[in-house]
Amino acid sequence: MFAPLAVFGSLGWTEILLILFIALLLFGGKRLPSLAKDLGDGIRSFRKSLTGESDDSSQQISQEQERSVPKEETKTSKSKKSKSA
């Protein structure tokens, strides 16, 4: 139940609340959600790189390459048929 707090080690609730309060004072209420989102995105990409998962851009490139291969094959098969006729 408290597994996410294991990252903080021996920090108690009062220390965590104090850190959050200082972060609120430093960055303000408007920037704090965007900073938390950016931090979450960074952690997510770090975990993906550790597990070896590819990002969306490499998947899109591989899909585009797969789409282009059948087009090239159809061109070569048509040219072979026209040469044999």
Curated annotation (Swiss-Prot):
Protein known as: Sec-independent protein translocase protein TatA
GO BP annotation list: protein transport by the Tat complex
Record organism: Leptospira interrogans serogroup Icterohaemorrhagiae serovar Lai (strain 56601)
Disordered: annotated segments: 50-85
Keyword Hydrolase: no
Underlying gene: tatA
Comp. bias regions, Basic and acidic residues: 64-76
Membrane-topology annotation of the record: Single-pass membrane protein
The UniProt record lists the keyword Disulfide bond: no
